[in-house]
Amino acid sequence: MILKKNNIAEYILHLWQIEDYLRAFPQQAEANQELCDLNAMMHQENIMERGHLQLAKNALDELEDLHNDLLDQEATYRSAIIQISPSLNILKSKTDCPTMSDIEACLVLLYQIMLLKLQKRPISSETEQVQKQATQILQYLSKTYKEQ
């Protein structure tokens, strides 16, 4: 829970990474208690094939609530979202969930880029620019979340 409070966006990405790890290597669930507990939750929530833990969904909901508050309160934040929206809309249209929120799309973008880098696949300069924007938005949200 310390990671969640310190950087909620990293917390969500960390949970997604663990979910994928446990799907790929279920036998590793016994490596430590945290993995064992998360594996049990994944089985209980019936997401061993796909989907996200309720822990991750709840954290994303918290981030979404903060995002919506900031959209109403901060013109600079609203401007950053407007600027990245066209790129996020393209990303959303290429997923199986085109109605996902902008914040979830930012997280998906960063997660997909991480996977591409692990595979040593090239990242276009346009994608790197959008990554930079998404990172700044998520950093700001995480910082604001931590200060609450």
Language model: regions and residue ranges:
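N-terminal interaction modules that seed assembly of large macromolecular complexes
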Residues: 1-51
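Amphipathic, non-membrane alpha-helical segments in soluble helical-bundle scaffolds
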Residues: 5-8, 15, 53-56, 74-81, ...
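Charged, amphipathic alpha-helical oligomerization/scaffolding segments
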Residues: 17, 37, 41, 55-62, ...
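Residues that form generic nucleotide/phosphate-binding pockets
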Residues: 21, 41, 66, 87, ...
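Intrinsically disordered or highly flexible coil/loop and linker segments, enriched in small
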Residues: 24-28, 44-48, 69-72, 93-97, ...
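Heme-based O2/NO sensor domains and their adjacent alpha-helical segments
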Residues: 34-74
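Glycine-rich, aromatic-bearing surface loops/beta-hairpins
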Residues: 90-148
